[in-house]
């Protein structure tokens, strides 16, 4: 969901009592691509989603694998208070959009950013020193290890 509430820089909320919604990577339905390109992209996405689910088996708190919906408040009604999403973008775009500063080893290279968002208020919860990663698996592993 492209709409955000306030940006809150603080420690990540305690997720021990809450169910975390883990958003799957999106498949493409881009009509400008050939059928072969769409199938290849979607197969790659299926593999990413499988690996995402496997890696989350190491997460110690409650979570539910979900697909992204337009209105995130739907998840709130299902008992999911926070959403975990991995975003792929350029550092400058995320900094501009969220009005934050991000650490990244290679600032000109697009990377992966973990977005933790409250499902009802749409507030974005940020670490004191947000960071981007070159590999989505590293972003996910950092989240699992530190939350």
Predicted regions and their residues:
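Short beta-strand and adjacent turn/loop elements
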Residues: 1-147
